[in-house]
Amino acid sequence: MASQGTKRSYEQMETDGERQNATEIRASVGRMIDGIGRFYIQMCTELKLSDYEGRLIQNSLTIERMVLSAFDERRNRYLEEHPSAGKDPKKTGGPIYKRVDGKWMRELVLYDKEEIRRIWRQANNGDDATRGLTHMMIWHSNLNDTTYQRTRALVRTGMDPRMCSLMQGSTLPRRSGAAGAAVKGVGTMVMELIRMIKRGINDRNFWRGENGRKTRSAYERMCNILKGKFQTAAQRAMMDQVRESRNPGNAEIEDLIFSARSALILRGSVAHKSCLPACVYGPAVASGYNFEKEGYSLVGIDPFKLLQNSQVYSLIRPNENPAHKSQLVWMACHSAAFEDLRLLSFIRGTKVSPRGKLSTRGVQIASNENMDTMESSTLELRSRYWAIRTRSGGNTNQQRASAGQISVQPAFSVQRNLPFDKSTIMAAFTGNTEGRTSDMRAEIIRMMEGAKPEEMSFRGRGVFELSDEKATNPVVPSFDMSNEGSYFFGDNAEEYDN
Protein backbone atom coordinates (compact mmCIF):
# COMPACT_ATOMS: atom_id res chain seq x y z
CA MET A 1 0.00 0.00 0.00
CA ALA A 2 1.49 3.37 -0.92
CA SER A 3 2.23 5.61 2.00
CA GLN A 4 -0.29 8.32 2.76
CA GLY A 5 2.36 10.80 1.71
CA THR A 6 2.05 10.06 -1.98
CA LYS A 7 -1.67 9.39 -2.13
CA ARG A 8 -4.21 11.95 -1.09
CA SER A 9 -7.19 10.69 0.85
CA TYR A 10 -10.47 10.72 -1.08
CA GLU A 11 -11.69 13.58 0.96
CA GLN A 12 -8.72 15.56 -0.30
CA MET A 13 -9.56 14.59 -3.85
CA GLU A 14 -13.12 15.59 -3.15
CA THR A 15 -11.90 18.94 -1.82
CA ASP A 16 -9.35 20.99 -3.61
CA GLY A 17 -6.41 18.85 -2.67
CA GLU A 18 -5.07 21.31 -0.13
CA ARG A 19 -3.70 19.41 2.84
CA GLN A 20 -6.40 19.72 5.44
CA ASN A 21 -6.91 18.24 8.84
CA ALA A 22 -9.77 15.83 9.52
CA THR A 23 -12.13 18.53 10.78
CA GLU A 24 -11.62 20.72 7.73
CA ILE A 25 -12.09 17.75 5.43
CA ARG A 26 -15.33 16.76 7.19
CA ALA A 27 -16.62 20.34 6.94
CA SER A 28 -15.62 20.55 3.30
CA VAL A 29 -17.36 17.30 2.34
CA GLY A 30 -20.35 18.48 4.41
CA ARG A 31 -20.47 21.70 2.39
CA MET A 32 -20.65 19.66 -0.81
CA ILE A 33 -23.56 17.59 0.58
CA ASP A 34 -25.35 20.77 1.73
CA GLY A 35 -25.12 22.13 -1.81
CA ILE A 36 -26.65 19.01 -3.35
CA GLY A 37 -29.41 19.07 -0.73
CA ARG A 38 -30.25 22.74 -1.27
CA PHE A 39 -30.30 22.25 -5.04
CA TYR A 40 -32.65 19.29 -4.68
CA ILE A 41 -35.06 21.22 -2.45
CA GLN A 42 -35.17 24.07 -4.97
CA MET A 43 -35.80 21.68 -7.89
CA CYS A 44 -38.66 20.01 -6.00
CA THR A 45 -40.18 23.47 -5.52
CA GLU A 46 -39.75 24.32 -9.22
CA LEU A 47 -41.35 21.03 -10.24
CA LYS A 48 -44.11 21.37 -7.61
CA LEU A 49 -43.38 17.94 -6.14
CA SER A 50 -45.10 16.75 -2.98
CA ASP A 51 -42.94 15.47 -0.13
CA TYR A 52 -43.60 11.87 -1.23
CA GLU A 53 -42.84 12.63 -4.89
CA GLY A 54 -39.63 14.39 -3.86
CA ARG A 55 -38.50 11.23 -2.04
CA LEU A 56 -39.10 9.06 -5.11
CA ILE A 57 -35.73 7.76 -6.29
CA GLN A 58 -36.78 7.92 -9.97
CA ASN A 59 -37.43 11.67 -9.65
CA SER A 60 -34.09 12.06 -7.90
CA LEU A 61 -32.29 10.34 -10.79
CA THR A 62 -33.97 12.61 -13.35
CA ILE A 63 -33.08 15.76 -11.42
CA GLU A 64 -29.48 14.58 -10.92
CA ARG A 65 -29.19 13.77 -14.59
CA MET A 66 -30.52 17.19 -15.59
CA VAL A 67 -27.86 19.07 -13.65
CA LEU A 68 -25.09 16.74 -14.87
CA SER A 69 -26.22 17.32 -18.43
CA ALA A 70 -26.42 21.10 -17.90
CA PHE A 71 -22.75 21.14 -16.86
CA ASP A 72 -21.46 18.72 -19.51
CA GLU A 73 -19.41 21.27 -21.45
CA ARG A 74 -18.07 18.93 -24.11
CA ARG A 75 -21.40 17.40 -24.92
CA ASN A 76 -23.08 20.80 -24.94
CA ARG A 77 -20.47 22.08 -27.42
CA TYR A 78 -20.92 18.96 -29.53
CA LEU A 79 -24.71 19.41 -29.58
CA GLU A 80 -24.34 23.06 -30.63
CA GLU A 81 -22.08 22.06 -33.54
CA HIS A 82 -24.01 18.95 -34.63
CA PRO A 83 -27.66 19.91 -34.34
CA SER A 84 -29.86 16.81 -34.45
CA ALA A 85 -33.53 16.83 -35.27
CA GLY A 86 -35.81 17.40 -32.31
CA LYS A 87 -33.05 17.91 -29.75
CA ASP A 88 -32.61 21.40 -28.37
CA PRO A 89 -28.97 21.70 -27.28
CA LYS A 90 -29.89 24.43 -24.81
CA LYS A 91 -32.49 22.37 -22.94
CA THR A 92 -32.39 19.41 -20.61
CA GLY A 93 -35.10 17.33 -18.98
CA GLY A 94 -36.51 13.92 -18.31
CA PRO A 95 -39.41 12.01 -16.80
CA ILE A 96 -40.90 13.29 -13.54
CA TYR A 97 -43.39 11.02 -11.79
CA LYS A 98 -46.41 12.40 -9.96
CA ARG A 99 -49.28 10.82 -8.08
CA VAL A 100 -52.55 11.87 -9.74
CA ASP A 101 -55.93 10.47 -8.58
CA GLY A 102 -54.33 7.46 -6.95
CA LYS A 103 -52.22 6.63 -10.03
CA TRP A 104 -48.61 7.30 -10.97
CA MET A 105 -48.30 9.56 -14.02
CA ARG A 106 -45.20 10.31 -16.08
CA GLU A 107 -44.65 13.92 -17.06
CA LEU A 108 -41.78 14.93 -19.35
CA VAL A 109 -40.22 18.19 -18.20
CA LEU A 110 -37.88 20.45 -20.14
CA TYR A 111 -35.70 23.22 -18.69
CA ASP A 112 -33.13 25.65 -19.99
CA LYS A 113 -29.68 24.35 -19.08
CA GLU A 114 -28.81 27.93 -18.18
CA GLU A 115 -31.65 27.97 -15.64
CA ILE A 116 -30.54 24.66 -14.08
CA ARG A 117 -26.96 25.95 -13.84
CA ARG A 118 -28.27 29.09 -12.11
CA ILE A 119 -30.21 27.05 -9.53
CA TRP A 120 -27.20 24.76 -8.92
CA ARG A 121 -24.78 27.67 -8.45
CA GLN A 122 -27.21 29.47 -6.18
CA ALA A 123 -27.46 26.35 -3.99
CA ASN A 124 -23.64 26.19 -3.90
CA ASN A 125 -22.87 29.79 -2.92
CA GLY A 126 -22.27 30.89 -6.49
CA ASP A 127 -19.75 28.11 -7.16
CA ASP A 128 -19.78 25.57 -10.00
CA ALA A 129 -19.27 23.01 -7.22
CA THR A 130 -17.77 20.38 -9.51
CA ARG A 131 -17.23 18.08 -6.52
CA GLY A 132 -20.97 17.87 -5.95
CA LEU A 133 -21.45 16.96 -9.60
CA THR A 134 -18.76 14.27 -9.39
CA HIS A 135 -20.43 12.92 -6.26
CA MET A 136 -23.67 12.42 -8.21
CA MET A 137 -21.76 10.79 -11.08
CA ILE A 138 -20.25 8.29 -8.64
CA TRP A 139 -23.69 7.52 -7.22
CA HIS A 140 -24.97 6.82 -10.76
CA SER A 141 -21.89 4.71 -11.45
CA ASN A 142 -22.37 2.68 -8.26
CA LEU A 143 -26.02 2.11 -9.19
CA ASN A 144 -24.99 0.88 -12.65
CA ASP A 145 -22.38 -1.40 -11.08
CA THR A 146 -25.02 -3.13 -8.94
CA THR A 147 -27.65 -3.25 -11.68
CA TYR A 148 -25.78 -4.42 -14.76
CA GLN A 149 -23.04 -6.87 -15.54
CA ARG A 150 -20.75 -5.51 -18.25
CA THR A 151 -20.27 -8.81 -20.07
CA ARG A 152 -20.45 -7.37 -23.56
CA ALA A 153 -18.02 -4.54 -22.86
CA LEU A 154 -15.54 -7.02 -21.35
CA VAL A 155 -15.76 -9.40 -24.29
CA ARG A 156 -15.42 -6.57 -26.81
CA THR A 157 -12.07 -5.54 -25.34
CA GLY A 158 -10.83 -9.12 -25.23
CA MET A 159 -11.32 -9.63 -21.50
CA ASP A 160 -13.23 -12.39 -19.75
CA PRO A 161 -16.76 -11.72 -18.38
CA ARG A 162 -15.72 -13.48 -15.19
CA MET A 163 -13.45 -10.52 -14.48
CA CYS A 164 -16.46 -8.35 -13.66
CA SER A 165 -15.23 -7.69 -10.10
CA LEU A 166 -12.59 -5.41 -11.65
CA MET A 167 -15.12 -3.22 -13.43
CA GLN A 168 -16.13 -0.71 -10.76
CA GLY A 169 -16.81 2.72 -12.25
CA SER A 170 -16.92 1.46 -15.83
CA THR A 171 -19.79 3.82 -16.68
CA LEU A 172 -18.23 6.93 -15.10
CA PRO A 173 -17.83 9.78 -17.57
CA ARG A 174 -14.30 10.84 -18.51
CA ARG A 175 -14.81 14.17 -16.82
CA SER A 176 -15.16 12.75 -13.31
CA GLY A 177 -11.73 14.00 -12.20
CA ALA A 178 -9.47 12.64 -9.46
CA ALA A 179 -12.33 11.48 -7.25
CA GLY A 180 -13.69 9.52 -10.21
CA ALA A 181 -10.30 8.00 -11.05
CA ALA A 182 -9.95 6.83 -7.44
CA VAL A 183 -13.09 4.69 -7.59
CA LYS A 184 -12.37 3.08 -10.95
CA GLY A 185 -11.46 -0.61 -10.84
CA VAL A 186 -8.38 -2.09 -12.49
CA GLY A 187 -10.53 -3.60 -15.25
CA THR A 188 -12.13 -0.24 -15.99
CA MET A 189 -8.74 1.43 -16.46
CA VAL A 190 -7.51 -1.48 -18.60
CA MET A 191 -10.62 -1.26 -20.76
CA GLU A 192 -10.20 2.50 -21.30
CA LEU A 193 -6.55 1.97 -22.26
CA ILE A 194 -7.33 -0.91 -24.64
CA ARG A 195 -9.99 1.18 -26.39
CA MET A 196 -7.43 3.92 -26.82
CA ILE A 197 -4.75 1.57 -28.20
CA LYS A 198 -7.27 0.02 -30.62
CA ARG A 199 -8.15 3.45 -31.96
CA GLY A 200 -4.44 4.07 -32.48
CA ILE A 201 -4.10 0.81 -34.39
CA ASN A 202 -7.04 1.65 -36.66
CA ASP A 203 -6.41 5.36 -37.13
CA ARG A 204 -2.93 6.33 -38.30
CA ASN A 205 -3.25 9.91 -37.09
CA PHE A 206 -4.46 9.14 -33.59
CA TRP A 207 -1.05 9.68 -31.96
CA ARG A 208 0.13 12.33 -34.45
CA GLY A 209 0.13 16.10 -34.61
CA GLU A 210 -1.18 18.61 -32.09
CA ASN A 211 -4.08 16.39 -31.04
CA GLY A 212 -1.84 13.35 -30.83
CA ARG A 213 0.24 15.08 -28.19
CA LYS A 214 -2.83 15.55 -26.01
CA THR A 215 -3.84 11.97 -26.70
CA ARG A 216 -0.41 10.74 -25.68
CA SER A 217 -0.42 12.63 -22.41
CA ALA A 218 -3.91 11.31 -21.63
CA TYR A 219 -2.62 7.79 -22.35
CA GLU A 220 0.34 8.21 -20.02
CA ARG A 221 -1.85 9.74 -17.32
CA MET A 222 -4.23 6.77 -17.47
CA CYS A 223 -1.28 4.36 -17.29
CA ASN A 224 -0.08 6.16 -14.17
CA ILE A 225 -3.51 6.02 -12.55
CA LEU A 226 -3.60 2.28 -13.19
CA LYS A 227 -0.03 1.85 -11.94
CA GLY A 228 -1.01 3.61 -8.72
CA LYS A 229 -3.74 1.05 -8.14
CA PHE A 230 -1.36 -1.90 -8.21
CA GLN A 231 0.27 -2.96 -4.96
CA THR A 232 3.18 -5.10 -6.21
CA ALA A 233 6.41 -3.94 -7.83
CA ALA A 234 6.12 -6.36 -10.75
CA GLN A 235 2.63 -5.18 -11.70
CA ARG A 236 3.82 -1.57 -11.50
CA ALA A 237 6.90 -2.29 -13.60
CA MET A 238 4.61 -3.80 -16.20
CA MET A 239 2.60 -0.56 -16.29
CA ASP A 240 5.82 1.42 -16.83
CA GLN A 241 6.49 -0.78 -19.87
CA VAL A 242 3.03 -0.12 -21.27
CA ARG A 243 3.28 3.61 -20.61
CA GLU A 244 6.72 4.01 -22.23
CA SER A 245 5.86 2.09 -25.39
CA ARG A 246 6.67 4.23 -28.45
CA ASN A 247 3.83 2.89 -30.50
CA PRO A 248 1.23 1.12 -28.35
CA GLY A 249 -0.22 -1.93 -30.07
CA ASN A 250 -1.17 -5.55 -29.55
CA ALA A 251 1.78 -6.30 -27.26
CA GLU A 252 0.53 -3.61 -24.88
CA ILE A 253 -3.04 -4.93 -25.08
CA GLU A 254 -1.69 -8.37 -24.13
CA ASP A 255 0.22 -6.92 -21.19
CA LEU A 256 -2.83 -4.98 -20.02
CA ILE A 257 -5.10 -8.02 -20.15
CA PHE A 258 -2.43 -10.00 -18.30
CA SER A 259 -2.24 -7.36 -15.57
CA ALA A 260 -6.03 -7.23 -15.29
CA ARG A 261 -6.17 -11.01 -14.84
CA SER A 262 -3.44 -10.86 -12.25
CA ALA A 263 -5.53 -8.31 -10.32
CA LEU A 264 -8.10 -11.02 -9.60
CA ILE A 265 -5.59 -12.40 -7.09
CA LEU A 266 -3.11 -9.55 -6.57
CA ARG A 267 -5.86 -7.01 -6.14
CA GLY A 268 -5.47 -3.31 -6.81
CA SER A 269 -6.46 -0.46 -4.47
CA VAL A 270 -9.81 0.91 -5.50
CA ALA A 271 -11.57 3.56 -3.43
CA HIS A 272 -15.09 3.05 -2.15
CA LYS A 273 -17.40 5.84 -1.09
CA SER A 274 -21.01 5.85 -0.02
CA CYS A 275 -22.64 8.31 -2.42
CA LEU A 276 -26.37 8.65 -1.80
CA PRO A 277 -29.14 9.91 -4.10
CA ALA A 278 -29.97 13.62 -3.90
CA CYS A 279 -33.41 12.78 -2.49
CA VAL A 280 -31.65 11.64 0.71
CA TYR A 281 -29.64 14.86 1.14
CA GLY A 282 -32.54 17.20 0.26
CA PRO A 283 -34.96 16.23 3.06
CA ALA A 284 -32.08 16.14 5.58
CA VAL A 285 -31.14 19.72 4.72
CA ALA A 286 -34.81 20.72 4.68
CA SER A 287 -35.22 19.36 8.20
CA GLY A 288 -32.55 21.81 9.35
CA TYR A 289 -29.51 19.52 9.46
CA ASN A 290 -26.31 21.42 8.71
CA PHE A 291 -23.83 19.05 7.07
CA GLU A 292 -21.02 21.59 6.97
CA LYS A 293 -21.35 22.41 10.67
CA GLU A 294 -21.73 18.76 11.74
CA GLY A 295 -19.09 17.48 9.33
CA TYR A 296 -19.55 14.48 7.01
CA SER A 297 -17.45 11.63 5.66
CA LEU A 298 -18.20 9.35 2.72
CA VAL A 299 -16.19 6.50 4.20
CA GLY A 300 -17.29 6.35 7.83
CA ILE A 301 -20.51 6.05 9.82
CA ASP A 302 -22.21 9.18 8.39
CA PRO A 303 -23.91 7.65 5.32
CA PHE A 304 -25.16 4.75 7.45
CA LYS A 305 -26.65 7.13 10.04
CA LEU A 306 -28.22 9.22 7.29
CA LEU A 307 -29.85 6.16 5.70
CA GLN A 308 -31.11 4.94 9.11
CA ASN A 309 -33.22 8.10 9.28
CA SER A 310 -34.25 8.53 5.64
CA GLN A 311 -37.46 7.64 3.82
CA VAL A 312 -36.86 6.85 0.15
CA TYR A 313 -39.52 5.45 -2.18
CA SER A 314 -39.30 3.71 -5.52
CA LEU A 315 -41.67 2.83 -8.33
CA ILE A 316 -42.16 -0.93 -8.53
CA ARG A 317 -43.12 -2.83 -11.70
CA PRO A 318 -45.89 -5.45 -11.43
CA ASN A 319 -43.68 -8.52 -10.98
CA GLU A 320 -40.83 -6.97 -9.02
CA ASN A 321 -40.01 -7.70 -5.40
CA PRO A 322 -39.67 -4.48 -3.31
CA ALA A 323 -37.19 -6.19 -0.93
CA HIS A 324 -34.98 -7.05 -3.91
CA LYS A 325 -35.22 -3.51 -5.24
CA SER A 326 -34.14 -2.33 -1.78
CA GLN A 327 -31.10 -4.61 -1.80
CA LEU A 328 -30.05 -3.28 -5.21
CA VAL A 329 -30.19 0.34 -4.04
CA TRP A 330 -28.62 -0.44 -0.64
CA MET A 331 -25.60 -2.04 -2.35
CA ALA A 332 -25.31 0.93 -4.69
CA CYS A 333 -25.43 3.39 -1.78
CA HIS A 334 -22.42 1.70 -0.22
CA SER A 335 -20.48 1.10 -3.43
CA ALA A 336 -20.58 -2.62 -2.67
CA ALA A 337 -21.37 -4.28 -6.01
CA PHE A 338 -18.25 -6.44 -5.93
CA GLU A 339 -18.00 -7.05 -2.19
CA ASP A 340 -18.37 -10.49 -0.62
CA LEU A 341 -22.08 -11.19 -0.11
CA ARG A 342 -21.46 -12.99 3.17
CA LEU A 343 -20.01 -9.82 4.63
CA LEU A 344 -22.77 -7.65 3.16
CA SER A 345 -25.43 -9.91 4.68
CA PHE A 346 -23.74 -9.53 8.06
CA ILE A 347 -23.54 -5.72 7.85
CA ARG A 348 -27.04 -5.28 6.50
CA GLY A 349 -28.56 -7.77 8.92
CA THR A 350 -30.63 -9.45 6.19
CA LYS A 351 -29.55 -11.92 3.54
CA VAL A 352 -27.99 -10.30 0.49
CA SER A 353 -28.59 -12.44 -2.61
CA PRO A 354 -26.73 -12.72 -5.93
CA ARG A 355 -27.97 -10.47 -8.76
CA GLY A 356 -29.44 -13.37 -10.75
CA LYS A 357 -31.72 -14.33 -7.86
CA LEU A 358 -33.24 -10.86 -7.54
CA SER A 359 -36.68 -10.26 -9.02
CA THR A 360 -36.02 -6.69 -9.99
CA ARG A 361 -34.91 -4.78 -13.03
CA GLY A 362 -33.04 -1.47 -12.93
CA VAL A 363 -34.29 1.53 -10.97
CA GLN A 364 -34.92 3.68 -14.04
CA ILE A 365 -38.21 3.32 -15.87
CA ALA A 366 -38.05 3.39 -19.68
CA SER A 367 -40.25 5.87 -21.52
CA ASN A 368 -42.27 3.12 -23.20
CA GLU A 369 -43.19 1.32 -19.97
CA ASN A 370 -46.82 1.31 -18.99
CA MET A 371 -47.51 3.53 -15.97
CA ASP A 372 -51.00 2.16 -15.26
CA THR A 373 -49.68 -0.87 -13.43
CA MET A 374 -46.91 0.95 -11.49
CA GLU A 375 -47.01 0.82 -7.72
CA SER A 376 -44.58 2.44 -5.32
CA SER A 377 -43.03 1.21 -2.12
CA THR A 378 -40.54 2.19 0.57
CA LEU A 379 -36.92 1.22 0.01
CA GLU A 380 -35.42 -0.46 3.09
CA LEU A 381 -31.95 1.10 3.21
CA ARG A 382 -31.13 0.61 6.90
CA SER A 383 -28.32 -1.55 8.22
CA ARG A 384 -27.60 -3.61 11.33
CA TYR A 385 -23.92 -2.56 11.58
CA TRP A 386 -21.64 -0.09 9.90
CA ALA A 387 -18.07 -0.54 8.68
CA ILE A 388 -15.28 1.64 7.37
CA ARG A 389 -14.92 1.74 3.58
CA THR A 390 -11.58 0.65 2.19
CA ARG A 391 -9.43 1.56 -0.76
CA SER A 392 -7.06 -1.34 -0.30
CA GLY A 393 -7.46 -4.53 -2.27
CA GLY A 394 -6.73 -6.55 0.85
CA ASN A 395 -4.61 -9.72 0.77
CA THR A 396 -5.61 -12.44 -1.47
CA ASN A 397 -7.47 -15.55 -0.84
CA GLN A 398 -9.38 -18.26 -2.52
CA GLN A 399 -12.68 -20.01 -2.24
CA ARG A 400 -14.98 -22.21 -4.28
CA ALA A 401 -16.13 -19.75 -6.89
CA SER A 402 -19.09 -19.40 -9.14
CA ALA A 403 -19.47 -19.69 -12.87
CA GLY A 404 -19.87 -15.93 -13.05
CA GLN A 405 -17.74 -13.70 -10.87
CA ILE A 406 -14.50 -15.34 -9.73
CA SER A 407 -13.10 -12.78 -7.33
CA VAL A 408 -14.23 -9.88 -5.14
CA GLN A 409 -13.15 -6.27 -4.72
CA PRO A 410 -13.57 -5.43 -1.03
CA ALA A 411 -15.59 -2.32 -0.15
CA PHE A 412 -15.36 -2.59 3.63
CA SER A 413 -12.33 -2.81 5.85
CA VAL A 414 -13.41 -5.90 7.78
CA GLN A 415 -11.45 -9.05 8.65
CA ARG A 416 -12.29 -12.00 6.39
CA ASN A 417 -10.69 -14.25 3.85
CA LEU A 418 -11.18 -12.97 0.32
CA PRO A 419 -12.70 -15.50 -2.05
CA PHE A 420 -11.32 -16.18 -5.50
CA ASP A 421 -11.19 -19.27 -7.61
CA LYS A 422 -7.47 -19.90 -7.94
CA SER A 423 -7.60 -22.84 -10.32
CA THR A 424 -9.87 -20.99 -12.77
CA ILE A 425 -7.75 -17.86 -12.66
CA MET A 426 -4.41 -19.65 -12.94
CA ALA A 427 -5.66 -21.70 -15.90
CA ALA A 428 -5.61 -18.49 -17.93
CA PHE A 429 -1.89 -18.06 -17.29
CA THR A 430 -0.49 -21.01 -19.19
CA GLY A 431 2.77 -20.61 -21.00
CA ASN A 432 2.52 -17.03 -22.18
CA THR A 433 5.67 -15.60 -20.63
CA GLU A 434 7.71 -14.51 -23.63
CA GLY A 435 8.47 -11.00 -24.83
CA ARG A 436 9.71 -7.85 -23.15
CA THR A 437 7.72 -8.34 -19.98
CA SER A 438 8.65 -11.99 -19.45
CA ASP A 439 10.51 -11.48 -16.17
CA MET A 440 7.66 -9.42 -14.72
CA ARG A 441 5.12 -11.96 -15.91
CA ALA A 442 7.06 -14.78 -14.28
CA GLU A 443 7.29 -12.82 -11.03
CA ILE A 444 3.55 -11.99 -11.05
CA ILE A 445 2.63 -15.63 -11.71
CA ARG A 446 4.93 -16.71 -8.87
CA MET A 447 3.17 -14.34 -6.45
CA MET A 448 -0.24 -15.54 -7.59
CA GLU A 449 0.77 -19.17 -7.12
CA GLY A 450 1.86 -18.29 -3.60
CA ALA A 451 -1.44 -16.67 -2.59
CA LYS A 452 -2.87 -18.64 0.33
CA PRO A 453 -6.55 -19.49 0.76
CA GLU A 454 -6.57 -19.26 4.53
CA GLU A 455 -4.91 -15.86 4.76
CA MET A 456 -6.97 -13.23 6.53
CA SER A 457 -7.30 -9.76 5.06
CA PHE A 458 -7.91 -6.62 7.13
CA ARG A 459 -6.83 -8.55 10.22
CA GLY A 460 -8.45 -7.35 13.43
CA ARG A 461 -10.81 -4.99 11.60
CA GLY A 462 -14.47 -5.41 12.41
CA VAL A 463 -17.90 -3.91 11.91
CA PHE A 464 -19.44 -1.59 14.50
CA GLU A 465 -22.79 -1.11 16.19
CA LEU A 466 -24.59 1.97 14.90
CA SER A 467 -24.38 3.43 18.41
CA ASP A 468 -20.57 3.13 18.27
CA GLU A 469 -19.83 6.34 16.34
CA LYS A 470 -16.17 6.49 17.33
CA ALA A 471 -15.55 2.90 16.20
CA THR A 472 -14.25 1.76 19.57
CA ASN A 473 -15.61 -1.82 19.78
CA PRO A 474 -15.06 -3.80 16.59
CA VAL A 475 -17.26 -6.86 16.09
CA VAL A 476 -15.30 -9.33 13.95
CA PRO A 477 -17.95 -11.20 11.95
CA SER A 478 -18.02 -14.95 11.49
CA PHE A 479 -19.16 -16.31 8.15
CA ASP A 480 -20.91 -19.28 6.80
CA MET A 481 -18.28 -20.38 4.29
CA SER A 482 -20.75 -22.61 2.48
CA ASN A 483 -22.59 -19.58 1.20
CA GLU A 484 -21.93 -18.05 -2.18
CA GLY A 485 -19.69 -15.00 -2.01
CA SER A 486 -20.15 -13.57 -5.50
CA TYR A 487 -22.93 -11.18 -6.49
CA PHE A 488 -22.79 -11.83 -10.23
CA PHE A 489 -23.00 -15.57 -9.69
CA GLY A 490 -23.32 -17.36 -13.08
CA ASP A 491 -25.47 -14.48 -13.81
CA ASN A 492 -28.24 -13.19 -16.02
CA ALA A 493 -28.18 -9.52 -15.05
CA GLU A 494 -29.19 -7.18 -17.85
CA GLU A 495 -26.48 -5.69 -19.99
CA TYR A 496 -25.66 -2.00 -19.50
CA ASP A 497 -26.54 0.02 -22.58
CA ASN A 498 -25.84 3.70 -23.00
UniProtKB/Swiss-Prot annotation:
Q: Where is this motif: Bipartite nuclear localization signal?
A: 198-216
Which Pfam family name is an example for this entry? Flu_NP
Phosphoprotein listed as a keyword: no
The subcellular location is: Virion; Host nucleus
One GO cellular component from the entry? helical viral capsid
Question: What UniProt keywords are attached to this protein's entry?
Answer: Capsid protein, Helical capsid protein, Host nucleus, Host-virus interaction, Ribonucleoprotein, RNA-binding, Viral nucleoprotein, Viral penetration into host nucleus, Virion, Virus entry into host cell
User: Record's InterPro entries?
Assistant: Flu_NP
Its principal location? virion
Please give the residue ranges the record annotates as the region Disordered.
Answer: 1-21
Assembly? Homomultimerizes to form the nucleocapsid. May bind host exportin-1/XPO1. Binds to viral genomic RNA. Protein-RNA contacts are mediated by a combination of electrostatic interactions between positively charged residues and the phosphate backbone and planar interactions between aromatic side chains and bases.
Indicate what this protein is called per its UniProt record: Nucleoprotein
Name of encoding gene: NP
